[in-house]
Amino acid sequence: MAEASDLLEWPKKDNRRFLHVVYRVGDLDRTIEFYTEVFGMKLLRKRDIPEEKYSNAFLGFGPETSNFVVELTYNYGVSSYDIGTGFGHFAISTQDVSKLVENVRAKGGNVTREPGPVKGGGSVIAFVKDPDGYTFELIQRGPTPEPFCQVMLRVGDLDRAIKFYEKALGMRLLRKIERPEYKYTIGMMGYAEEYESIVLELTYNYDVTEYTKGNAYAQIAIGTDDVYKSGEVIKIVNQELGGKITREAGPLPGLGTKIVSFLDPDGWKTVLVDNKDFLKELE
C-alpha cells in the first residue's frame, strides 16, 4: 500500500492550474461578440475543424499561459442545447456591477437578478444570461489578475465531492459556506486564493441528490506535469469515492497532446492536460 499512499501525495506536489472550461454554443460569432463587447473578454484563438464538423473559440481576460479561459464549441448545424439542472453558473468579477449590467442590457442580454447585496452577505452581485442561456454571476470586487473567477456546479453529496477534488485533483477547500436558512451549502475549491484565481464552486441543495447534465456544458481542463501518474491517482480515488476514467492517459490522435479524462462521483467531467504539450499547442 506504500506505493498507493505515495501516489496519493502526487496531486499536491504536481504543478496544477485551471486551464479552461469547455461548453457548447449554438452560434459561435454571436457568443464571441457578446463576450467581447459585453464582458470585455478577448478572443485569443479560433479554429475550424471542417472534417469533424465543429469550430472552437478561446476567450478570456488574459493569455492562456496565465489565465483561465472559455473554450466554446460550435457543432455544425446545432443551434441549441439543454443546459440541464446540474450546471449552475460562471462568475465574472468587476469593479462596477451596475455598469456591467447596463452594458448587458444594452446589448440585448437577459438580466435575471438586478445588482444588489447577496443574501446574508455584503457583496454586491447580479445575475445575467448569455445568448445561449448560460448564467453568469457578476460580483463586485477590486482589481484582480483573474476576473473569470468561478465555475459553479451542483453536487448530490458535498462532503464526497470535496474529498474527491482534494484527493484526486489536489485542490484545497478554500471556504465552506453553510446557509441553512436557504437550504444550501457551498464548498469553494481551488489551487490558489479565491480573489486571485478561478475557483470551482460546488453547491449542495438540501435533499437534492441528482441533477440532469443536459448536453451543453462539457468539462474543465486542468494542467499537470504527468498525466500517467495523475491517471493512476484518479483510479485509486474512483474506487473509494466513485467516478470513472473516460479516456486512459495518453496522446490525442493528430494533436499528440497527452491527456487523461474522467468523471467525478456526480458525473462532472475533468480533463488533465500535460503542461508542456499545452504550451506547445499555443505556439
From Swiss-Prot:
In the record, N-acetylalanine modifications are located at: 2
Give the binding site residues for substrate.
Answer: 24, 75, 89, 150, 154, 205, 251-252
Its recorded reaction(s) are:
(R)-S-lactoylglutathione = methylglyoxal + glutathione
> What's the Enzyme Commission number for this chain?
4.4.1.5
The entry marks the following residues as binding Zn(2+), namely 20, 71, 89, 137, 150, 201
* GO cellular component terms attached to this protein's record: chloroplast envelope; cytosol; extracellular region; peroxisome; plant-type vacuole; secretory vesicle
According to the UniProt entry, its GO molecular function terms are: dioxygenase activity; lactoylglutathione lyase activity; metal ion binding
Kindly list the cofactors needed. Zn(2+)
Q: Which Pfam families match?
A: Glyoxalase
What's in the keyword line of the UniProt record?
Acetylation, Dioxygenase, Lyase, Manganese, Metal-binding, Oxidoreductase, Phosphoprotein, Repeat, Zinc
Q: Could you tell me which residue ranges the VOC domain spans?
A: 17-141, 147-275
Which residues does the record give as a divalent metal cation binding sites? 150, 201, 219, 271
The cofactor note reads: Binds 1 zinc ion per subunit. In the homodimer, two zinc ions are bound between subunits.
Query: What pathway is this protein said to act in by its record?
Result: Secondary metabolite metabolism; methylglyoxal degradation; (R)-lactate from methylglyoxal: step 1/2
Enumerate the InterPro entries for this protein: Glyas_Bleomycin-R_OHBP_Dase (IPR029068), Glyas_Fos-R_dOase_dom (IPR004360), Glyoxalase_1 (IPR004361), Glyoxalase_1_CS (IPR018146), VOC (IPR037523)
Q: Where is the active site?
A: 137
Q: Which GO terms describe its biological process?
A: methylglyoxal catabolic process to D-lactate via S-lactoyl-glutathione
How is the polypeptide modified once translated? Phosphorylated by SnRK2.8.
Q: Where is the signal peptide?
A: none
Subunit record text: Homodimer.
* The family this protein is said to belong to: Belongs to the glyoxalase I family.
Relate the protein's function as given in its record.
Answer: Catalyzes the conversion of hemimercaptal, formed from methylglyoxal and glutathione, to S-lactoylglutathione.
Specify the protein name.
Lactoylglutathione lyase GLX1
